[in-house]
């Protein structure tokens, strides 16, 4: 991929063609989703009323449909326009000289220099829970920024993403800290809207058959298409919506869910302190998600403090555009996160026990070595 990009940079025609293709690729899902939603609203407003006898019922259905349509459109474009957020948005997280920082990183155990290099912000040093093995705090060599907890580099977006969940081609953007709320709302709105259309069109088709209307009338193909598509989308989107709500209540991202499921990071780094001992001396696993604050607190941390923010697509996070300094909003910026103090205390306790055990084993090995040397003499 890098080779192709280098070749294209030398040829303006290929570079222009590549830019146009990328633009069309990102434009297509936006146009497609907008047209499908608008077409479904057209069917609801201008075709379905022809099969409903009561004008009052038709008006009520139209109001509900328009409301759901507007919510779908607003949440869809808020996902795109607000974006997920990136460490690059915060000047404090930028590394001025990456090579110097790597060579002089005071948090690197292999460092022998006393002169420190670039340091992460103080708030990040205080609150960071995940460190990169023996190499200290995480940083991205491609973006030249410090990587806060739960952030990852997205190859599709070409930059690091705050609390990255996944890259979604239907929006041509990443789902992350700032737009995850709107992603959940969009899935919920679309699922409700699709079930709403399916029930209405299904009832019309049922009456059309049972009342023998097919003998004198022709059923609109648009209505049949809405029936089929709304049912298919309702099932698919409902599954995604429920899964996203589940992850939200667990305070997990899709990446963290997969890492936890497949143990991607490995036993050596993450599993050493994920257990405790009961009164009988048996080992049992503890909750490994240090960001799990409980269902309601997890939900509020993403969806906002009250039911109004839960229902309406209202921004509840603090973006770098409104408050550029991380310290101005300590736990609502995608850089620092609240942790479960009980789980954190268990981690510390188990780490201390592990350290004591290592010291005892080291002392025992030293004693055995001295005894062997004494016996040899």
UniProtKB/Swiss-Prot annotation:
Residue ranges annotated for the DHHC domain, each copy included: 138-188
PTM annotation: Autopalmitoylated.
UniProt keyword annotation of Lipid biosynthesis present: no
GO molecular function: protein-cysteine S-palmitoyltransferase activity
Short name of one Pfam family: DHHC
Topology in membrane: Multi-pass membrane protein
Keyword Cytoplasm carried by entry: no
Cytoplasmic side: 1-31, 84-181, 244-377
Ranges per topology, Lumenal: 53-62, 203-222
Bilayer-crossing regions: 32-52, 63-83, 182-202, 223-243
GO cellular component: endoplasmic reticulum; Golgi apparatus; vacuolar membrane
EC number(s) on file: 2.3.1.225
Active site (catalytic residues): 168
Keywords, in A-Z order: Acyltransferase, Lipoprotein, Membrane, Palmitate, Transferase, Transmembrane, Transmembrane helix, Vacuole
Localization annotation: Vacuole membrane
The reaction(s) this protein catalyses: L-cysteinyl-[protein] + hexadecanoyl-CoA = S-hexadecanoyl-L-cysteinyl-[protein] + CoA
Biological-process GO terms, alphabetical: protein targeting to membrane
Family designation: Belongs to the DHHC palmitoyltransferase family. PFA3 subfamily.
UniProt remark on domains: The DHHC domain is required for palmitoyltransferase activity.
Role description: Palmitoyltransferase specific for VAC8. Palmitoylates VAC8 at one or more of its N-terminal cysteine residues, which is required for its proper membrane localization.
Name the UniProt record assigns to this protein: Palmitoyltransferase PFA3
């Amino acid at each position: 991929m890098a080779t192709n990009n280098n070749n294209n940079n030398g040829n303006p025609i290929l570079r222009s063609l590549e830019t146009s293709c990328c633009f069309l690729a990102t434009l297509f899902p936006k146009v497609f989703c907008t047209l499908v939603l608008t077409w479904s609203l057209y069917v609801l407003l201008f075709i379905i009323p022809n099969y409903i006898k009561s004008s009052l019922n038709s008006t009520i259905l139209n109001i509900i449909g328009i409301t759901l349509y507007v919510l779908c459109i607003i949440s869809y474009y808020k996902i795109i326009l607000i974006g997920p957020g990136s460490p690059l948005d915060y000047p404090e997280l930028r590394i001025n000289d990456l090579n110097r920082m790597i060579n002089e990183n005071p948090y690197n155990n292999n460092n022998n220099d006393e002169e420190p290099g670039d340091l992460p912000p103080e708030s990040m040093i205080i609150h960071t829970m995940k460190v990169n093995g023996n190499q200290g705090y995480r940083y991205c060599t491609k973006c030249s920024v410090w990587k806060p907890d739960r952030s990852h580099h997205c190859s599709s977006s070409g930059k690091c993403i705050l609390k990255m969940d996944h890259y979604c081609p239907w929006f041509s953007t990443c789902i992350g800290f700032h737009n995850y709320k709107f992603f959940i709302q969009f899935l919920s709105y679309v699922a409700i809207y699709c079930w709403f259309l399916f029930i209405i069109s299904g009832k019309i088709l049922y009456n059309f058959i049972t009342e023998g209307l097919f003998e004198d009338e022709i059923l609109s193909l648009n209505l049949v298409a809405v029936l089929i598509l709304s049912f298919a989308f309702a099932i698919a989107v409902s599954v995604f919506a429920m899964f996203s709500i589940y992850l939200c209540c667990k305070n997990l991202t899709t990446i963290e869910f997969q890492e936890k499921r497949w143990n991607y990071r490995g036993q050596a780094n993450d599993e050493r302190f994920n257990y405790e001992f009961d009164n009988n001396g048996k080992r049992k696993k503890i909750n490994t998600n240090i960001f799990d604050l409980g269902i309601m607190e997890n939900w509020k941390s993403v969806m906002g403090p009250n039911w109004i923010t839960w229902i309406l697509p209202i921004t509840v996070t603090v973006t770098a555009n409104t408050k550029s300094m991380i310290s101005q909003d300590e736990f609502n910026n995608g850089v620092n996160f609240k942790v479960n103090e009980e789980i954190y205390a268990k981690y510390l306790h188990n780490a201390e026990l592990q350290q004591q055990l290592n010291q005892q084993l080291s002392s025992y090995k030293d004693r055995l070595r001295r005894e062997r040397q004494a016996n040899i003499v």
